[in-house]
Amino acid sequence: MLKKFRVVLMLLCCSLFLVGCGNKSSENSVSEEKQPVELNISAAASLKEVMADLQAAYKKVADNVTLVVNYGGSGSLQQQIEQGAPCDLFISAGQKQMNTLKEKGLLVDETTKDLVQNELVLITAKGVEIKSFDDLKNSDIKHIAVGDPGSVPAGKYADEVLVNTGIKDSISDKLVFAKDVKEVLAWVASGNADAGFVYLSDALNNSNVNVVKNVPEVNEHSPIIYPVSVIKDSKNIEEAKKFEDFLFTEEAQKIFEKYGYKANS
């Protein structure tokens, strides 16, 4: 009888041990599963089309990460970040906005990098015939759309072009100012403005405008560089760094090139 009791007790102990191991294994598998992460990205309005493709591509390599993108003028986004709006990563269309955030200690400094370059172009509405900057002086050109130079990098670059080509004073009464480059594009595409200055990446993806002239950087405007940085107050700094690293991969850079951007050399 005692022998039988010992056998039963031994079997019971083995069963409890196996159950314990199973629970531990189950706990380990749960802990190894990737937890869902939501990253808040603040991106210049001009990035809207390319970001859609980048989001889809990143989902394939990090399916637990959801990218929530807030688009706007770079100056407006800068102010939102300063005021504490949720943001893990910022992609600006100009250095000025990023530099301001850096000076205020709001960035993870080692993550602040130049991502891609863009190009400024002069566009017109369909049916509007101009061939040069001087043609903007023509009496039939009533409205010329530009981004607000104070908050929109494309507007600042356009202002530099108008000053450096010597035509700003003669067309200043025709200028209409938009909150971001997408609004400039919409005004020209709809015919509400006769001409405007946008990025090449915007113009390439809109069949309702004509590209009149590509504006070279030399002597006409400063380089158009899109910097990127992780925000210091991010609650997901490591995940934000991983997404930033992805933006510099060959796959991501090819997506940028498809939309008219250039790799930053």
Which residues fall in each region the model found?
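Conserved beta-strand core positions
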Residues: 39, 65-67, 120
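Conserved strand-loop elements at the edges of beta-sheets that form or border functional pockets
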Residues: 71
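Exported/periplasmic ABC-transporter solute-binding proteins
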Residues: 21-56, 75, 79-82, 94-95, ...
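Signal peptide-proximal N-terminal region
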Residues: 56-68
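C-terminal motif of bacterial Sec signal peptides marking the signal peptidase cleavage site
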Residues: 16-20
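Short, glycine-/small- and polar/acidic-enriched structural segments
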Residues: 111-120
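Periplasmic-binding protein-like
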Residues: 88-92
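Bacterial N-terminal signal peptides that target proteins for export
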Residues: 1-9
